[in-house]
């Protein structure tokens, strides 16, 4: 094999690796958290991403004397995944998000949390495939496991990943 052929093969291999890397790169962590529900789109060579970004926060209050009244706050806005004001010492709070795949192809759903609220949040279902026109209800839980009493903020993203080409698996 000639020297020119070897160089051509090495360059070709590097270009293929670069294309694969760029084609499968997922959306990055947000630089700034949203204040209201926001939609954005992101594409690579192989996949389209639709991202719904939700603000999220909770204020964890200390439990004072047994007979003291404490004000709890609940957020009922459907676009807001805030958990309000809760007492500390093992409180569990849940919010529900309803998702529908309106497309005629499968979509992978990925849920992510960002900010200092992240360690407190969990999902009933994550990293799953939604079939065409399927509806799914997901519980988003926040559990205060003897966490420091303060405000926690961040963002919860619902990412829908769809293959641009039908022959590609969504994984």
Regions found by a protein language model. Name each.
Residues 1-45:
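Secretory targeting signatures
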Residues 27-58, 146-171:
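Terminal connector regions
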Residues 37-102, 125-127:
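Beta-sheet-dominated interaction scaffolds and their linkers
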Residues 77-79, 88-96, 134-137, 147-157:
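Short, solvent-exposed loop/turn segments enriched in Ser/Thr/Gly
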Residues 96-98, 108, 122, 137-141, ...:
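Ordered hydrophobic segments in well-structured contexts
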Residues 100-119, 157-160:
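Short acidic, flexible loop segments centered on an aromatic residue
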Residues 116-125, 163-167:
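Short aromatic-acidic-glycine turn motif
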Residues 121-147:
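Intrinsically disordered, low-complexity Pro/Gly/Ser/Thr-rich segments with frequent PxxP/GP/PP motifs
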């Amino acid at each position: 094999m000639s020297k020119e052929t070897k160089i051509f093969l090495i360059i070709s291999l590097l270009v293929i690796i670069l294309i694969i890397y760029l084609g499968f790169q997922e959306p990055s962590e947000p630089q700034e958290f949203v204040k209201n529900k926001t939609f954005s789109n992101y594409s690579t060579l192989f996949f389209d991403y639709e991202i719904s970004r939700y603000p999220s926060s909770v204020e964890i209050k200390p439990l004072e004397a047994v007979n003291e009244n404490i004000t709890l706050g609940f957020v009922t806005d459907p676009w807001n995944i805030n958990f309000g004001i809760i007492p500390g010492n093992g409180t569990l709070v849940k919010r529900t998000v309803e998702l529908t795949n309106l497309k005629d192809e499968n979509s992978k759903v990925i849920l992510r949390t960002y900010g200092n609220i992240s360690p407190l949040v969990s999902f009933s279902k994550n990293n799953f495939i939604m079939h065409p026109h399927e509806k799914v209800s997901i519980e988003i839980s926040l559990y205060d496991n003897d966490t420091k009493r303060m405000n926690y903020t961040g963002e919860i993203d619902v990412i829908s990943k769809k293959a641009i080409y039908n022959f590609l698996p969504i994984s």
